[in-house]
Swiss-Prot record:
Its main location: secreted. It is found in: Secreted. One of its GO terms (biological process) is apoptotic process. Belongs to the flavin monoamine oxidase family. FIG1 subfamily. This is L-amino-acid oxidase ACTX-8. Its EC number is 1.4.3.2. Catalyzes an oxidative deamination of predominantly hydrophobic and aromatic L-amino acids, thus producing hydrogen peroxide that may contribute to the diverse toxic effects of this enzyme. Exhibits diverse biological activities, such as hemorrhage, hemolysis, edema, apoptosis of vascular endothelial cells or tumor cell lines, antibacterial and antiparasitic activities, as well as regulation of platelet aggregation. Its effect on platelets is controversial, since it either induces aggregation or inhibits agonist-induced aggregation. Expressed by the venom gland. GO terms for molecular function: L-amino-acid oxidase activity; toxin activity. One of its GO terms (cellular component) is extracellular region. It is an enzyme of class 1 (oxidoreductase).
Length: 19
């Protein structure tokens, strides 16, 4: 994740929830 890409970081932090 990157501070310039909050959506990408959100996806990484919530990957299991998205499954």
């Amino acid at each position: 994740a990157d501070d310039r890409n909050p959506l990408e970081e959100f996806r990484e932090n919530n990957y299991e929830e998205f499954l």
